[in-house]
């Protein structure tokens, strides 16, 4: 069977498709590595400045005790990971973290709660969080679990810019990872978010023991949505002791980079976020991910409950690569550069209290918020 994968043809570099077949996606993954990266870079340059990366900060506003059974997640109440449970964070503390994120160069502030879905009693608090963070001039994103259409509308009316709800993996592999909510439940939440008028952030996790065809299936599901997600986080599994996935075999790093590249080709106008798992990646691998089309990262020492490179390490890597973080609307060029220089100069300073428990550490730690 002959499959056309020339994504850099005159139409391929600008066309957003919603009719990808599994054979086409598998063929992209099977390309010689250098050819695949070249195609992905060409598509990337057709739609984005290749030397700019969007920067977000992720804060856990409610940690642990989640009733779901996602096998990768240390926040599930079903697994003994030593994670300290935390109630919904006070709005004042959230706003302080948002100010710190903006000072470090983030343009988007993402707030995550370990819920199956938000309760109605929680909605006034989370909508107030959105309004207050928006006042700082930051874009806002939330991940709160499944949403009803009414909840999605309430978040949109509060000013929420993005809602994150990952598909995680292919429909075929999904049942091996999660049983407490269906794939269709996830798609229904994405529909509710889109119909409410918000931007969609949706991606998945690789390295959970899935096949190459499952990685193709995940990207096919995302790309073939009626409207492709504006933001596509690609996570490398962070194995946490106590979860069912603590001993899963590592994914080859080249396969991860291929996943970034194929996502870029299939979703040419989406921001592809290099997300969880970056702490285990050296600078050279991260640089290859940027070459493959990743153009968004999270700043900060934690992603919810797992480690992330320190902010100053990202600043130094950007400097080496000639990459500039996408600036907040209020930042002038001079102010932005001053913020980056200040970050470099203070990277030896004593660290502020941790926002999150590090679920990848062997010994439990106390969460200081």
Swiss-Prot record:
Protein name: Biotin synthase
Domain Radical SAM core, residue spans: 51-269
BP term (GO), one: biotin biosynthetic process
A single GO molecular function term of this UniProt record: 4 iron, 4 sulfur cluster binding
NCBIfam families documented for this protein: bioB
Pfam families assigned to the protein according to its UniProt record, in alphabetical order: BATS (PF06968), Radical_SAM (PF04055)
PANTHER family: BIOTIN SYNTHASE, BIOTIN SYNTHASE, MITOCHONDRIAL
Gene3D superfamilies: Aldolase class I
Entry EC number(s): 2.8.1.6
This protein's pathway: Cofactor biosynthesis; biotin biosynthesis; biotin from 7,8-diaminononanoate: step 2/2
Family statement: Belongs to the radical SAM superfamily. Biotin synthase family.
Catalytic activity: (4R,5S)-dethiobiotin + (sulfur carrier)-SH + 2 reduced [2Fe-2S]-[ferredoxin] + 2 S-adenosyl-L-methionine = (sulfur carrier)-H + biotin + 2 5'-deoxyadenosine + 2 L-methionine + 2 oxidized [2Fe-2S]-[ferredoxin]
Broad class of enzyme this protein falls into: transferase
Role of this protein: Catalyzes the conversion of dethiobiotin (DTB) to biotin by the insertion of a sulfur atom into dethiobiotin via a radical-based mechanism.
SUPFAM superfamilies associated with the record: Radical SAM enzymes (SSF102114)
């Amino acid at each position: 069977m002959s499959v056309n994968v020339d994504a850099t043809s005159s139409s391929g570099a600008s066309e957003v498709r919603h009719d990808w077949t599994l054979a086409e996606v598998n063929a992209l993954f099977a390309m010689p590595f250098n050819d695949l990266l070249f195609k992905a870079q060409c598509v990337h340059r057709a739609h984005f400045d290749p030397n700019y990366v969007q920067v977000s900060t992720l804060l856990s506003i409610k940690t642990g005790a989640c009733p779901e059974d996602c096998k990768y997640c240390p926040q599930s109440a079903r697994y003994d990971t030593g994670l300290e449970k935390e109630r919904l964070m006070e709005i004042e503390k959230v706003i302080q973290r948002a100010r710190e994120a903006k000072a470090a160069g983030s343009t988007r502030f993402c707030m995550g709660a370990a819920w199956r879905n938000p309760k109605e009693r929680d909605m006034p608090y989370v909508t107030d969080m959105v309004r207050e963070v928006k006042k700082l001039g930051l874009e806002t994103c939330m991940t709160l679990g499944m949403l009803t259409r009414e909840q999605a509308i309430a978040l949109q009316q509060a000013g929420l810019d993005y809602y994150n709800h990952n598909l995680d993996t292919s429909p075929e592999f999904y049942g091996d990872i999660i049983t407490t909510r269906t794939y269709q439940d996830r798609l229904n939440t994405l529909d509710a978010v889109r119909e409410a008028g918000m931007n969609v952030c949706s991606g998945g996790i690789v390295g959970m023991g899935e096949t190459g065809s499952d990685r193709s299936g995940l990207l096919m599901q995302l790309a073939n949505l009626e409207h492709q997600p504006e933001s596509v986080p690609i996570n490398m599994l962070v194995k946490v002791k106590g979860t069912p996935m603590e001993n899963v075999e590592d994914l080859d790093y080249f396969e991860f980079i291929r996943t970034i590249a194929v996502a870029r080709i299939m979703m040419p106008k989406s921001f592809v976020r290099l997300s969880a798992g970056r702490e285990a990646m050296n600078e050279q691998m991260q640089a290859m991910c940027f070459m493959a089309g990743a153009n968004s990262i999270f700043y900060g020492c934690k992603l919810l409950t797992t480690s992330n490179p320190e902010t100053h390490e990202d600043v130094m890597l950007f400097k080496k690569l000639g990459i500039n973080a996408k600036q907040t609307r209020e930042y002038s060029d001079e102010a932005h550069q001053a913020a980056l220089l200040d970050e470099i100069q203070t990277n030896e300073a004593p660290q502020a209290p941790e926002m999150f428990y590090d679920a990848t550490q062997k010994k439990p730690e106390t969460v200081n918020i």
